[in-house]
Amino acid sequence: MKRPSGRVADQLRSIRITRNYTKHAEGSVLVEFGDTKVICTVSVENGVPRFLKGQGQGWLTAEYGMLPRSTGERNQREASRGKQGGRTLEIQRLIGRSLRAALDMSKLGDITLYVDCDVIQADGGTRTASITGAMVALCDALAVIKKRGGLKGGNPLKHMIAAVSVGMYQGEAVLDLDYLEDSAAETDLNVVMTSAGGFIEVQGTAEGAPFQPEDFNAMLALAQKGMNEIFELQQAALAD
């Protein structure tokens, strides 16, 4: 089996995490997984949604979008169509769920964190890149809140989280699929994990033929290997 990119089965794409990419948001990152590029920002606002008022905890919510020409052909802006598509809603809910799992909301205070992930160039794995980059932006936003005198209840961060795609391509488990592989893969999994080794979410779909338990185990093992490398890259970015 030869991957279109020339990578071996357990090899990630080149990953870059650039912090403080924009000047206004409390946390901002440009994350690059190969040719996939996503700008992730975290904005801090006082107050919480109505359903959380008086409960003594904060909130985090996420939005996701793609520039019209982030793909090979221009896509119409969802705003011009008057509503978000099902894929967009699914992805932004995944991003929000994943990042909330990293936080103890009771220590956040009366604050809402708005996470925005905007894909400027897509080559597969946009949702996993978004989660990975937004986690670093979230860390920077928490540091800003603390500097402003917040987080008096302690650090709300329970652990880091990251995400990566794995799949079955030409009968073999492969790590971090690009668009060409994703389009031809027999199975595609998106895996979200904590730095402590726990799973937050596993999304999997077979195309054409079911995948077997041994395939699933092989893909999870690859995801765990890749995730360990990604956590190291996140920590290196935060240390700069």
Swiss-Prot record:
Family (UniProt) = Belongs to the RNase PH family.
In the record, biological process GO terms are: rRNA catabolic process; rRNA processing; tRNA processing
Q: Where does phosphate bind?
A: 87, 125-127
Gene encoding it? rph
What species is this protein from?
A: Pseudomonas putida (strain ATCC 47054 / DSM 6125 / CFBP 8728 / NCIMB 11950 / KT2440)
The highest taxon in the source lineage is Bacteria
Entry keywords, A to Z: Nucleotidyltransferase, RNA-binding, rRNA processing, Transferase, tRNA processing, tRNA-binding
Question: Which GO molecular function terms does the record list?
Answer: 3'-5'-RNA exonuclease activity; tRNA binding; tRNA nucleotidyltransferase activity
- The catalytic activity of this protein is classed by the Enzyme Commission as 2.7.7.56
**Signal peptide (residue range):** none
What CDD domains does this protein map onto?
A: RNase_PH_bact (cd11362)
| Pfam families in the record | RNase_PH, RNase_PH_C
- Record-linked NCBIfam families: RNasePH (TIGR01966)
The protein's matches in InterPro entries, at most eight in alphabetical order, are given as: ExoRNase_PH_dom1, ExoRNase_PH_dom2, ExoRNase_PH_dom2_sf, PNPase/RNase_PH_dom_sf, Ribosomal_Su5_D2-typ_SF, RNase_PH, RNase_PH_bac-type, RNase_PH_CS
Catalysed reaction equations from the record: tRNA(n+1) + phosphate = tRNA(n) + a ribonucleoside 5'-diphosphate
What is the official name of this protein in its record? Ribonuclease PH
Q: How does it assemble?
A: Homohexameric ring arranged as a trimer of dimers.
**Per its database record, what is this protein's job?**
Phosphorolytic 3'-5' exoribonuclease that plays an important role in tRNA 3'-end maturation. Removes nucleotide residues following the 3'-CCA terminus of tRNAs; can also add nucleotides to the ends of RNA molecules by using nucleoside diphosphates as substrates, but this may not be physiologically important. Probably plays a role in initiation of 16S rRNA degradation (leading to ribosome degradation) during starvation.
